[in-house]
Amino acid sequence: MHFGSPNLTCNRKILDGVISGLSNYGNCVGVPTVSSEITFADCYERNPVVNAMAVGYTNKKVFTSKPSKKGSVYYVGAKTGRDGIGGAMMASEQFTGDEGIKRPTVQVGDPYLEKLLIEASLELFETGAVIASQDMGAAGLTSSTTEIALKGNMGMLIHISKIPLREENMEPWEI
C-alpha cells in the first residue's frame, strides 16, 4: 500500500479507511489479513495505490475459467450499480497535481454475500455442472464476458436487459 504523508489529515483519513476496509471485509469473508506493507511518498498524495490479493490452495481442481464446450451464461452475485464505474480507468491515469482530489470510484462490496457466494460456488463446482467460471474484475461484465469467451475461443451473447440492477435507469455502458 502506498500513501501520501500520514501527517496530512486527508491522507490519514484515506489510510485509516483503507486499513479498516481491508480488515473488516477480509474478516467477514473469513480470509484473514496475514501481511501488508505500507510506504509513504509525496507522489501518492490524495491518490494512493493499494494492491491486495487472496491466496488459497486446494488439493483438487474444482473450477476453470476456460470453457470446454458451449453452454448458458449466468450472472451470479450482487446486483449491478454505478459504483466502481471508471475505477480501472482512473487507476491507469497520470496525475499532474492540477486535478484536485479525484472522486473515489470504489465498488461497494458485500462481504457477507461474497462469503455465501464463495461457499455456494465451491459446492456447485463439485457437481461438475459448471463449464467455466470467471470473476468480474475491475471492468465488470465487460472484462469477464470477454475473457471467458476468448479463453473458450467462442462468442457470447449477453442480454444486458436481464442483468439485475441496483439502480434504475442505468445506461447499457454503465451495466
Write out the residue ranges for each language-model feature.
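Glycine/proline-enriched, intrinsically flexible loops and inter-domain linkers
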Residues: 1-175
